[in-house]
Amino acid sequence: MARHSIKMIALLTAFGLASAVMTVQAAERIAFIPKLVGVGFFTSGGNGAQEAGKALGIDVTYDGPTEPSVSGQVQLVNNFVNQGYDAIIVSAVSPDGLCPALKRAMQRGVKILTWDSDTKPECRSYYINQGTPKQLGSMLVEMAAHQVDKEKAKVAFFYSSPTVTDQNQWVKEAKAKISQEHPGWEIVTTQFGYNDATKSLQTAEGIIKAYPDLDAIIAPDANALPAAAQAAENLKRNNLAIVGFSTPNVMRPYVQRGTVKEFGLWDVVQQGKISVYVANALLKNMPMNVGDSLDIPGIGKVTVSPNSEQGYHYEAKGNGIVLLPERVIFNKNNIDKYDF
C-alpha cells in the first residue's frame, strides 16, 4: 500500500513538473500577424520578428490570411488564443473590425499589440508605429513636391483600401498639407488596389489613361507603388512623378531605370524586431507606461508615447505608442545599401 502511494506521488510530481514546463513554453509563444501573406513588406516584418524571437529564446509564429480580411484575421486571432499563445501582434486591416476578438483575447490574459496598422487604442496595449500620420503624410507630399515644380498640377492618390487604418490616416494628412501648401494642386482621383498585384496594375493603368495630363501619383502602399511604376513603364509615361511607400528590393529596378526618382519607407525588419521586444517586455512585467524606455540590442532606445501622438483621445495605463526611430527616403544613391 505504501509502495503504491509512493508511485502515485511520483507520477503526480512528474505530471506537475511536465505541466509547469508546458506552461513556461506556452508563455513564450508570440503570434505575429500581417494583413496578408505573400507580400514582401509583411514577410520582411515577419523575418525581423522571428529574428528577435531567436535572440530572446521565444517561439515566434508568423502567419496571416491569404487575403486582407477582418474575418481572416479574426480566425487567426481566435486560433492563437485557443492554442495558448501568450501574445499576439497584428497589423490590423480595420480599426474596429478586430476589436471584439482582441478584447476577448485580452480578457483571457493574452497580450495584444499592433504593428504597421493600428486598431482603436482600447483594443490593444501598444502600437509599434512606423511614424505619426503627420510625419508620413508630410513625407509623401514632400517627395512629390521635389519633382512637381508647377504651381498648378494634377495629383492622384492610389493605395490599398478605403478602410485600412494606417494608409487612410496618412492620406488624410497628405491631402490637408496639399490644401495648405500647394493650393494649385488638384487631387483628381483616389483609387484602390485592394492589396492585389493584378488589380493594382489594372487600376494604375486606368488612372494614367483616364488622366493623360496627370503630374503625380502618390501611392503609400507596398502593392500600389510598384504597380504605378510598372503602369507608367507599360504606357511609356516618362514625365510622371511616382512616389509612395514600398520596400527597396521591390522598387530597386524602377529606381535604377529612372521610373521612380525617390520613395520612402521605414526599416520594416526593425519594426518586426521592436514589436517582439516590446511584447517580451510585457510578458516579463517590465514597466511600459508612457515615458518608459526599452533598450533593444542593435537598434537602441525606444520610448512609449501617448496615444495622442496618433491623434487619439484614449489614454490608459499600460497603453500607448512606440515609434520607430527613423524613416528613410530611398533614391539611386542609397537604395543598394538596403536589403529587405
From Swiss-Prot:
The keyword Ubl conjugation does not apply. GO terms for cellular component: ATP-binding cassette (ABC) transporter complex; outer membrane-bounded periplasmic space. It comes from the Bacteria. It is found in: Periplasm. The keyword Transmembrane does not apply. Coiled coil: none annotated. Gene3D superfamilies: 3.40.50.2300. Pfam families: Peripla_BP_4 (PF13407). CDD domains: PBP1_LsrB_Quorum_Sensing. Keywords: Periplasm, Signal. InterPro entries: Bact_Solute-Bind_Prot2 (IPR050555), LsrB (IPR030159), Peripla_BP_I (IPR028082), SBP_2_dom (IPR025997). GO terms for molecular function: carbohydrate binding. Belongs to the bacterial solute-binding protein 2 family. NCBIfam families: PRK15408.1. The complex is composed of two ATP-binding proteins (LsrA), two transmembrane proteins (LsrC and LsrD) and a solute-binding protein (LsrB). This is Autoinducer 2-binding protein LsrB. It comes from Salmonella paratyphi B (strain ATCC BAA-1250 / SPB7). The lineage of its organism: Bacteria, Pseudomonadati, Pseudomonadota, Gammaproteobacteria, Enterobacterales. The gene is lsrB.
